[in-house]
């Protein structure tokens, strides 16, 4: 889908709430870099003032030494302090010019240090703050956002801020100081010719105002399209195995081409606007310089033209010509500064749009830590849904310390959601979840998740070594503890056979390992964590029978004397659970032990019959309900 101006921006609602995001950026982060800004600003002023010294001294030398049209003087410096001979005056002029260059180099260095240091500090803080805020958002936020779009904000948009905070502010400071300094010098020498030299200023202001109003929505669209392109690229790289196995490379080529072309069009639209704007500024600035040259030159050789009065010496004329050139450069660069500002403003709005996202789970550091005494877990009339659509409703059951509770039911029954509520991936809409009598919302999120180990069906390994992945979340573990955890997870043997053993790189998301190997590393991670409560979400769903046997053996050891929740489609793996909770359409329809549920002849017995191959003995009502659930699932995926 093409991204139009103002449309399809995932953070549009937050962007509209951002009130002058650039001012907000400086209010929030500027004070922390006050020293760097002070150095940069003072150094910028002094460096630019020193840049005015050579042309001024050249004008003095021409009038006093070469044309002898006025006495040699340096403003407030007493005449008796100055050399009386032309040779001495010339030597002093050279010394002052050389000194201004040397001292100016020092201040230019300090200026660059100040702007670079402040920009790096701020962009680092912005990126980290935005990431920290994103980490604290509930899983419903990530369900609605694309990874590539979020990466674009944390990378591209923050980098755009860095360019303005460094190059943009640096150029802006030089521009402001130069325009003010040059104007003061010119008016001091000859206010009439100074007015002529400043003729381009109102024209440039008018052109710039028009440029801002035109370019702002274009940059907004461009930032949205680059986010969409990054999302497409990230999605395709993550699914490269599916693309290759489906022989859909050409199809994905076309989709990336479409997304890239949308970005190309939006970017070129902004570029074309800049292309038309910048030459106009240069032409106006050049016109101002030419006008100053013509009027001043005529004044020197033929006297004051038209309504102008007074005398203009050759030295003063040379000062005007040189300073007019210094005035022309910042005028031409003014458009570049405005361009960088507009880019940064669009990016800062997206960054603060992310920071302003609602839905962060409350995690007050002052909340007490969870105190797990035995691991008794109670679900008390729990209801939760997305967008007012209930996923689980009125769920109530209790798991005693050391028990294993299995959650079973058809696809979409709400099993995984029930366990995610325990981990506070989401917060309940109604009811309570208690661990040893403590509401999970009344304890710190850190201590809650530290007390719960999670092994899911979609095992995620980070890019790094096997050792680092086992120790993830328990970073203080030593090598001996890591090896013992791997042995308990039936992983030590295959790890030892890897090329570098525990120091073998697993590749992006663990692609160098098989599914069963990744799962056993995940189990080793849970063993090392040694949690009081364990959550197993389809931990053996995608492995072969032999691997399942090994994993199940390690899980049996891990769950011993530990409160455990397990979800499994293969009912044979959970038939020994002390408590089996059967869900359908987000509600508990029955619960009990395996034998008891089979005798009841309810949904659990029917699901067991399906896996036992007893299809012909299933009631027609069960088959009809299954068909309706499948139809709803397919409709929801469309």
Model-derived segments and spans:
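An intracellular "coupling" helix at the cytosolic face of ABC transporter transmembrane type-1 domains
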Residues: 27, 31-34, 139, 158-165, ...
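ABC ATPase nucleotide-binding domain helical subdomain, centered on the C-loop/LSGGQ "ABC signature"
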Residues: 128, 357, 430-434, 442, ...
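Short cytosolic helices in intracellular loops of multi-pass membrane proteins
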Residues: 121-140, 146-155, 220-262, 328-335, ...
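Helix-loop-helix
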Residues: 66, 185-198, 280-349
């Amino acid at each position: 889908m093409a991204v139009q101006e103002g449309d399809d921006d995932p953070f549009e609602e937050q962007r509209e709430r951002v009130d002058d995001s650039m001012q907000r950026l400086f209010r929030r982060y500027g004070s922390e870099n006050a020293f760097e800004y002070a150095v940069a600003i003072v150094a910028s002023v002094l460096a630019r003032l020193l840049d005015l010294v050579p042309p001024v001294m050249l004008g003095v030398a021409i009038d006093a030494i070469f044309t002898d049209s006025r006495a040699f003087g340096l403003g407030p410096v007493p005449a008796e302090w100055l050399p009386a001979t032309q040779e001495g005056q010339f030597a002093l002029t050279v010394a002052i010019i050389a000194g201004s260059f040397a001292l100016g180099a020092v201040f230019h260095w300090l200026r660059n240090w100040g702007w670079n240091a402040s920009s790096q500090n701020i962009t680092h803080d912005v990126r980290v703050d935005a990431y920290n805020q994103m980490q604290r958002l509930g899983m419903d936020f990530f369900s609605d956002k694309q990874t590539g779009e979020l990466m674009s904000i944390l990378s591209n948009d923050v980098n755009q801020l860095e360019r303005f905070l460094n190059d943009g502010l640096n150029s802006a400071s030089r521009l402001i100081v130069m325009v003010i300094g040059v104007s003061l010098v010119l008016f001091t020498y000859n206010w009439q010719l100074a007015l002529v030299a400043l003729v381009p200023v109102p024209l440039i202001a008018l052109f710039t105002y028009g440029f801002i109003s035109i370019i702002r929505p274009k940059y907004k669209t461009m930032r949205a399209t680059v986010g969409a392109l990054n999302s497409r690229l990230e999605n395709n790289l993550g699914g490269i195995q599916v693309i290759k196995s489906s022989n859909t490379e050409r199809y994905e080529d076309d989709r990336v081409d479409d997304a890239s072309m949308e970005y190309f069009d939006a970017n070129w639209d902004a570029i074309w606007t800049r292309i038309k704007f910048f030459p106009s500024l240069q032409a106006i600035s050049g016109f101002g310089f030419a006008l100053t040259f013509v009027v001043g030159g005529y004044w020197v050789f033929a006297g004051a033209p038209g309504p102008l009065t007074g005398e203009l010496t050759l030295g003063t004329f040379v000062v005007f010509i040189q300073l007019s050139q210094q005035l022309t450069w910042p005028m031409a660069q003014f458009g570049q500064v405005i361009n960088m500002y507009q880019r940064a403003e669009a990016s800062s709005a997206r960054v603060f749009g992310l920071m302003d996202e609602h839905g962060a789970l409350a995690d007050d550091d002052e909340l007490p830590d969870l105190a797990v005494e035995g691991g008794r877990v109670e679900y008390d009339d729990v209801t939760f849904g997305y967008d007012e659509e209930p996923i689980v409703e009125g769920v109530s059951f209790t798991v005693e310390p050391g028990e294993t509770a299995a959650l079973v039911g058809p696809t979409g029954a709400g099993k995984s959601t029930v366990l995610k509520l325990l981990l506070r991936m989401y917060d309940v809409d109604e009811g309570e979840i208690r661990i040893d009598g403590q509401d999970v919302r009344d304890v710190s999120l850190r201590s809650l998740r530290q007390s719960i180990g999670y092994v899911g069906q979609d095992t995620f390994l980070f890019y790094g070594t096997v050792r680092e992945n086992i120790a993830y979340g328990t970073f203080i573990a030593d090598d001996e503890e890591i090896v013992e955890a791997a042995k308990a997870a039936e992983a030590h043997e295959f790890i030892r056979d890897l090329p570098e053993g525990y120091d073998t790189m697993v590749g992006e998301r663990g692609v160098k390992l098989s599914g069963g190997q990744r799962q056993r590393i995940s189990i080793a991670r849970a063993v090392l964590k040694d949690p009081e409560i364990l959550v197993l979400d389809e931990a053996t769903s995608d492995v072969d029978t032999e691997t399942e046997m090994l994993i199940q053996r390690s899980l049996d050891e891990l769950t011993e004397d530990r409160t455990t929740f397990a979800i499994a489609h293969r009912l044979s793996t959970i038939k020994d659970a002390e408590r089996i909770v059967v869900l359908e359409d987000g509600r508990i329809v029955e619960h009990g032990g395996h034998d008891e549920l089979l005798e009841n002849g309810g949904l659990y017995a029917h699901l067991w019959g399906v896996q036992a191959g007893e299809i012909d003995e299933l009631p027609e009502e069960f088959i009809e309900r299954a068909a309706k659930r499948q139809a709803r699932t397919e409709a929801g995926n469309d």
